[in-house]
Amino acid sequence: MSSTFSGDETAPFFGFLGAAAALVFSCMGAAYGTAKSGVGVASMGVMRPELVMKSIVPVVMAGVLGIYGLIIAVIISTGINPKAKSYYLFDGYAHLSSGLACGLAGLSAGMAIGIVGDAGVRANAQQPKLFVGMILILIFAEALALYGLIVGIILSSRAGQSRAE
C-alpha cells in the first residue's frame, strides 16, 4: 500500500505535543496568575474601590501569557505538514522543545505574577508608594515568559534544518 507520507511517522506526534504543551502550560500560568491576583484585587476593592482599575495591571499581565503560548502553538502547527514536505524526528523534537520552553516559562511567569500581584495590590491599598515597585517586579516576572517565547521561536525555526533540500 502506497502512502504519500514522507518522513518519520511518529514525528508529527511530538510536534503536535509541543503545540499543545505551549498552549496548555501558558494558559495554566495565565489562569493561575489571573485568579491569584484577581482575588487580591477583589479583596482590596472592598476597602478601597477607587484603586480597582489601577490594580488591574497584574490581571492583564497574567492574561498576556496565554497569548505567548498561542503564538508558539500556531507557529508549530503551521510547520507540521508532512504531506507537503518531509517531517522527521528532529523536526518533531524541535517543535516539542519549542512548546515546552514557551509553555513552562509561561507557567512559571504566571505563578510569579499571581503571587506578586496578589501581595502587591493589597500592599498598594495600604501604601500607594509601593505601586511602582510592584510594577517593576511584575515586569521582571513577565520577562520570564518573554524569554520562553523567544527561545521557542528560535527552536521552532530549527525544524527542517536536519536535512539538505
From Swiss-Prot:
Chain ranges on the Lumenal side, renumbered to this chain: 1-10, 77-95, 156-165
Domain of life per record: Eukaryota
Cellular compartments per GO CC: membrane; proton-transporting V-type ATPase, V0 domain; vacuolar membrane
Residues at the site labelled Essential for proton translocation: 142
Topological category with respect to the lipid bilayer: Multi-pass membrane protein
Family matches, as Pfam families: ATP-synt_C
Compartmental location: Vacuole membrane
Keywords annotated in UniProt: Hydrogen ion transport, Ion transport, Membrane, Transmembrane, Transmembrane helix, Transport, Vacuole
Entry's transmembrane regions: 11-33, 56-76, 96-117, 130-155
Membrane side Cytoplasmic: residue ranges: 34-55, 118-129
Molecular function per GO: proton-transporting ATPase activity, rotational mechanism
Chief site of localization: membrane
Coiled-coil intervals, chain numbering: none
Subunit structure: V-ATPase is a heteromultimeric enzyme composed of a peripheral catalytic V1 complex (main components: subunits A, B, C, D, E, and F) attached to an integral membrane V0 proton pore complex (main component: the proteolipid protein; which is present as a hexamer that forms the proton-conducting pore).
Family assignment from sequence similarity: Belongs to the V-ATPase proteolipid subunit family.
NCBIfam families: V_ATP_synt_C
Function per UniProt: Proton-conducting pore forming subunit of the membrane integral V0 complex of vacuolar ATPase. V-ATPase is responsible for acidifying a variety of intracellular compartments in eukaryotic cells.
Protein name: V-type proton ATPase 16 kDa proteolipid subunit
Source species of the chain: Gossypium hirsutum (Upland cotton)
Lineage: Eukaryota, Viridiplantae, Streptophyta, Embryophyta, Tracheophyta
Protein encoded by which gene: CVA16-2
